[in-house]
């Protein structure tokens, strides 16, 4: 239980930040799923278009430190490899 005014304010801020971070994390997951769905669908042009938009989302979430930059790079690398493998 937050007793001081400072602790009450920090509790309010933490709740707000947690909700915002959850929203960003959800956007990230949705973007990744969209690329995977396009890859499974087999339409290379659509997969590439979705891939480009999802890269922006992944980078922005990493810039805001919601996920580590290395995790973002790993996601981007694996999705890129999957999209490129569609041509082969």
From Swiss-Prot:
Coiled coil spans: none
Function: Binds directly to 16S ribosomal RNA.
Keywords from the named record: Ribonucleoprotein, Ribosomal protein, RNA-binding, rRNA-binding
Species assigned in the record: Azoarcus sp. (strain BH72)
Species lineage: Bacteria, Pseudomonadati, Pseudomonadota, Betaproteobacteria, Rhodocyclales
Protein name: Small ribosomal subunit protein bS20
GO cellular component: a single term: cytosol
Listed InterPro entries: Ribosomal_bS20, Ribosomal_bS20_sf
Protein family: Belongs to the bacterial ribosomal protein bS20 family.
Pfam families: Ribosomal_S20p
Biased composition (Basic residues): 7-19
Entry-linked Gene3D superfamilies: Ribosomal protein S20
UniProt GO MF annotations: small ribosomal subunit rRNA binding; structural constituent of ribosome
GO BP annotations listed: translation
Positions of the UniProt region annotated as Disordered: 1-25
